[in-house]
């Protein structure tokens, strides 16, 4: 098996946090459930939806703003309001089968919740978890961030 790529990730939502922050740092919403993973973004890449490429970091809680260089083992693709949105799955060691199941289960649930939130916010479009796509594929579909990027083109 080839060595997974390493990426720099900045933590936006520490594991256990109820505050959902966007890549620009603003609070998007307060969740009724804590985030089960450290969630952040790869500041060097823009995802297909026009925002920083998302990343989940498995393991112990990391503080808000932590910057970590870590292996991207896989990726999950979500569709949010009809836009593809890859999430790199990162950890020091290869995720266990149990962790992989938990990640996929979370994103299936998250897609349903985000769909309801988008209905309430009157933001149309399909919401779903499409499943695994691979870290290399997610990185290939992303584009390098340049100085012209100042935030996502749409509100999330």
Where are these regions (language model features)?
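Hydrophobic N-terminal alpha-helices or hydrophobic patches in metabolic proteins across all domains
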Residues: 1-156
């Amino acid at each position: 098996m080839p060595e997974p790529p390493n990426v720099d990730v900045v933590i936006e939502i520490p594991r256990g946090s109820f505050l959902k922050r966007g890549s620009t740092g603003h609070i998007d919403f307060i969740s009724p459930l804590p985030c089960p993973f450290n969630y952040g973004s790869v500041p060097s890449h823009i995802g297909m939806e026009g925002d920083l490429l998302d990343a989940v970091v498995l393991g112990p809680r990391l503080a808000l703003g932590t910057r970590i260089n870590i292996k991207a083992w896989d990726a999950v693709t979500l569709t949010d309001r009809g836009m593809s949105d890859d999430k790199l799955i990162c950890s020091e060691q290869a995720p266990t089968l149990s962790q992989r199941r938990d990640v996929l289960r979370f994103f299936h649930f998250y897609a349903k919740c985000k769909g309801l939130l988008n209905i309430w916010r009157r933001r149309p479009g399909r919401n779903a978890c499409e499943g695994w796509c691979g870290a290399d594929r997610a990185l290939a579909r992303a584009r390098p961030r340049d100085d012209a990027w100042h935030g996502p083109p749409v509100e999330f």
